[in-house]
Regions:
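Transmembrane alpha-helices and their extracellular/periplasmic helix-loop junctions
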Residues: 1-38
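Alpha-helical scaffold segments in soluble metabolic enzymes
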Residues: 17, 43-46, 138
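Glycine- and acidic
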Residues: 17, 77-80, 120-121
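Juxtacatalytic helix/coil linker segments
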Residues: 24-111, 151-156
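Hydrophobic alpha-helical packing residues
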Residues: 92, 96, 139, 143-146
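Catalytic core of nucleotidyl cyclases, primarily class III adenylyl/guanylyl cyclases
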Residues: 99-131, 145-171
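Amphipathic alpha-helical segments that line or abut small-molecule/effector binding pockets
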Residues: 130-137, 141
Length: 171
């Protein structure tokens, strides 16, 4: 007789816990999944904790943009078989994106070998310009080391050009 209320309470607890997981936390899981490939885990956490930080319709604010491009990429594509080039490019881009996320950047897009990165969107950052420049310096160092490592293997991997610009944008 004493176990009946305890068992009933446990069943209620686990039912409510299951409901929360299935219904209430569903939105948080969706946000994590939607943004995890584009922005750093810390920014994803902020968005999940306060989804109101995202506004639809766009707003005008100062942002820093970073652009990368591998010089001679077309020649590199023509000179190497896709089985050789694809893993190299994936490894290179993964390394570059890791650096972007370390600096709190948002990956806007990847076009072939080029990356476009934003700082201060979707969440505003007071130090976005500094983050962009520091990120660019780290990416440049990574890209130079990566290119040298590939050259040592006999693969001509082009030099990465990195550009940074700060200005007003609608985000």
């Amino acid at each position: 007789p004493l176990l009946d209320p305890i068992v009933g309470s446990l069943i209620t607890f686990f039912t409510l816990l299951g409901y929360r997981f299935m219904v209430v936390d569903k939105d948080k899981r969706y946000l994590r999944k939607a943004f995890s490939s584009y922005i750093s885990p810390n920014l994803v956490k902020q968005i999940v904790e306060d989804p109101k930080t995202l506004t639809l319709g766009g707003r005008r604010q100062e942002c820093t943009f970073l652009f990368t491009d591998i010089s001679g990429f077309t020649t590199m594509v023509e000179a190497n078989h896709p089985d050789v080039l694809t893993p190299l490019l994936n490894e290179y881009i993964d390394g570059m994106i890791e650096i972007v996320f370390e600096h709190g950047g948002t990956l806007d897009k990847i076009v072939g070998d080029a990356l476009v990165v934003m700082f201060s969107a979707p969440i505003e950052m007071a130090d976005h310009a500094e983050r962009g420049v520091r990120c660019a310096a780290r990416m440049d160092a990574f890209a130079d080391a990566y290119s040298e490592a590939q050259k040592a293997k006999g693969i001509a991997f082009g030099h990465t050009r990195v550009g940074v610009n700060t200005g007003m944008a609608v985000v």
